[in-house]
Amino acid sequence: MSNNIKRIIESKGLKIRFIAENAGISRQNLSRLINYPEQSTSLETAIKICNALNEPLEKVFTNVN
């Protein structure tokens, strides 16, 4: 699974801390996913991030198996 988190955050002018807080995950965890977009994460965390970004799973994460 790959992700577009960084691109979406930048295009919306958001802060990593804001998204992490709204997703209910640590800033460090979100930063890890941004810096290593091929890193996998749980479906639960992926959904939390998508909800915080107000974007569908298919737009934020690619190659979802």
Report residues per predicted region.
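A short, Lys/Arg-rich alpha-helix, primarily the initiator
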Residues: 1-15
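The alpha-helix within a helix-turn-helix
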Residues: 9, 20, 50
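Residue-level detection of the helix-turn-helix DNA-binding "recognition helix"
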Residues: 10, 24, 35, 65
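Key DNA-contact positions within bacterial/archaeal DNA-binding proteins
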Residues: 17, 28, 58
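Recognition helix of helix-turn-helix/homeodomain-like DNA-binding domains
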Residues: 25-39
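Short, basic-rich loop-to-helix N-cap that marks the start of a DNA-contacting helix
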Residues: 38-48
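Short C-terminal boundary/hinge segments that cap the last helix of small helical domains
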Residues: 54-65
